[in-house]
């Protein structure tokens, strides 16, 4: 039987970035719940991409990309057109697995997180035609 070499451990900066992302998503989810949203999914992964948070408020489902940066203004520019398309594709996959939400209004938001700042919720940050 052939031996396989274990993969090397992740670099410390990758671990730190992962933890920062998890912390930002937790802050974002708490902020959204305080604003009346119900969290339907977190870190929903598909072959097409990942959605950080899927949240519902009344007749609306929001697919929310969370961005954490040192400054809120830096976070605002962090969702690239390519990433937007991956989120739109992942949202389509989520809707296929949750058809009960397909008739609701759909929206693509961004939630920006920075240290010592309140989160900034960019409603309709981009649309599915991106």
UniProtKB/Swiss-Prot annotation:
Belongs to the UPF0102 family. InterPro entries: Restrct_endonuc-II-like (IPR011335), tRNA_endonuc-like_dom_sf (IPR011856), UPF0102_YraN-like (IPR003509). This is UPF0102 protein RPE_0358. It comes from Rhodopseudomonas palustris (strain BisA53). One of its GO terms (molecular function) is nucleic acid binding. Transmembrane segments: none annotated. Gene3D superfamilies: 3.40.1350.10. It comes from the Bacteria.
């Amino acid at each position: 039987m052939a031996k396989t070499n274990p993969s090397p451990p992740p670099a410390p900066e990758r671990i730190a970035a992962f933890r920062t992302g998890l912390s930002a998503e937790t802050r974002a989810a708490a902020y959204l719940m305080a604003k009346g949203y119900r969290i339907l999914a977190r870190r929903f992964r598909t072959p097409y991409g990942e959605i950080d948070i899927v949240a519902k408020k009344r007749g609306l489902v929001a697919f929310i990309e969370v961005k954490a940066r040192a400054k809120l203004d830096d976070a605002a520019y962090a969702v690239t057109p390519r990433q937007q398309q991956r989120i739109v594709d992942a949202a389509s996959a989520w809707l296929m697995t949750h058809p009960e939400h397909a008739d609701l209004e759909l929206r693509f938001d961004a939630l920006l997180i920075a240290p010592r700042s309140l989160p900034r919720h960019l409603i309709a940050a981009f649309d599915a035609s991106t």
